């Protein structure tokens, strides 16, 4: 017997971080979650599996229109034709209170109740599925504590949308502990809510499959579901099933040996080429390039993120626009011995360094600086106003981090001027 466990599909939610650029793969970004889900349904049919479990957040909230529901019904129809049932539990994003639009689902789709835990028995497979959907988005009670005892003689699967204790990066909906899940006596826990793949073996096998499609730079690497093989003795095998159509990657590039902007761009080019060549699939990659290290090129890089991105984008296009997209180029370098060098010079640069260090804790100075800078920004061409990353920080008043970030680059750049 085989089944697919998936969660956090977030149908029709956008991929973020690329759409503001004219060169962005707009159609791919718009349809990525659907395309990944279609791939999943195709895998379910081709395997084939005996059933599918969706452990919450099938949707990203109420639909903008009925097209999302119509698409889901169409894909469920594909499974119905080959006799594959689907068991859907709703989580915080698609809780009953969040969904204002609904459609009647095909009769091979079964949904877990919101009022109390319920059990679906698959008598021919000797499987019992236990679960409870969210009625409200802000479900903070321990739902697992109310799940029923395991059914004797059956493979018992608990379906639950939960943060699980220890996942502080996620909202603590339906909290419970790993020990509590193991103590329940089920063979397998099909969890959802946490977007990273995680698995624990013990009295029960507990799995977060991760989300189906990475949607931004914080969701890097391959994404998908899991396919589980089981028999009357329990869980026999779990394999990850990758169905995503675009992947996100963070690429750190050490510019320590670089002296100019051109050399930095060349090093980035080599790193991007290596990323593509080492990729195990032909799936497009959206990359954030982070330039690090103490480098003599630090002054040249200062404030040039937009230009850098254009340079790096040109490299990526040359490598094949269908494979590589640049999400962002971030400068995280520092000057080579900037502090010692500047302090050793008894001139205005030393005074400037002291002034900038003191400015970080001087609200009046920061307010005056913001007023002065806003005057320059408002006179700048509109293209610059929207493309220079620092301008946003200035408008929002986030001057402390700005001064701290620009100080090394400014001093390094001025130190070159005789």
Which residues are covered by each model-predicted region?
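N-terminal active-site segment of His-dependent metallophosphoesterases
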Residues: 1-68, 393-399
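Conserved residues at the C-terminal ends of beta-strands
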Residues: 55, 192, 292
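A short, flexible beta-alpha/helix-coil linker loop
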Residues: 57-61, 163-165, 294-296
């Amino acid at each position: 017997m085989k089944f697919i466990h998936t969660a956090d599909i977030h149908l029709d939610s956008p991929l973020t971080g690329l759409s503001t650029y004219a060169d962005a793969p707009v159609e791919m970004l718009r349809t990525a979650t659907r395309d990944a889900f279609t791939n999943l349904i195709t895998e379910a049919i081709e395997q084939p599996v005996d059933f599918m479990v969706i452990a919450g957040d099938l949707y990203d909230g109420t639909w903008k229109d009925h097209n999302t529901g119509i698409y889901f019904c169409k894909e469920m129809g594909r499974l119905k034709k080959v006799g594959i049932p689907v068991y859907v539990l709703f989580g915080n994003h698609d809780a009953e209170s969040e969904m204002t639009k609904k459609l009647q689902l095909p009769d091979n789709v079964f949904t877990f109740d919101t009022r109390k835990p319920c059990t679906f028995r698959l008598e021919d497979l000797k499987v019992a599925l236990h679960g409870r959907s969210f009625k409200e988005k802000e479900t903070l009670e321990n739902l697992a504590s109310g799940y029923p005892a395991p059914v004797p003689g059956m493979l018992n699967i608990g379906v639950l949308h939960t943060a699980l204790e220890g996942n502080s990066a996620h909202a603590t909906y339906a909290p419970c502990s790993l020990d509590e899940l193991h103590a329940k006596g089920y063979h397998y826990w099909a969890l959802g809510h946490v977007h990273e793949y995680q698995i624990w073996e013990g009295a029960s096998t507990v799995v977060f499959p991760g989300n189906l499609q990475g949607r931004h730079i914080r969701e890097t690497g391959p994404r998908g579901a899991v396919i589980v093989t089981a028999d009357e003795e329990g869980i026999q095998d779990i394999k990850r099933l990758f169905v995503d159509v675009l992947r996100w990657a963070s690429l750190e590039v050490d510019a320590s040996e670089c002296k100019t902007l051109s050399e930095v761009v060349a090093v980035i080019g080599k790193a991007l080429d290596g990323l593509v060549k080492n990729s195990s699939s032909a799936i497009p990659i959206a990359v954030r390039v982070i330039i690090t290290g103490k480098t003599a090129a630090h002054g040249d890089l200062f404030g040039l993120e937009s230009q850098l991105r254009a340079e790096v984008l040109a490299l990526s296009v040359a490598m094949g626009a269908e494979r590589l997209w640049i999400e962002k180029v971030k400068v995280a370098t520092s000057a080579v011995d900037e502090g010692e060098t500047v302090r050793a010079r008894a001139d205005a640069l030393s005074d400037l360094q002291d002034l900038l260090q003191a400015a970080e804790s001087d609200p009046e100075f920061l307010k005056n600086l913001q007023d002065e800078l806003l005057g320059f920004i408002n006179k700048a061409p509109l293209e610059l106003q929207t493309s220079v990353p620092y301008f946003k920080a200035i408008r929002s008043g986030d001057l402390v981090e700005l001064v701290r970030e620009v100080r090394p680059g400014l001093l390094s750049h001025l130190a070159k001027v005789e």
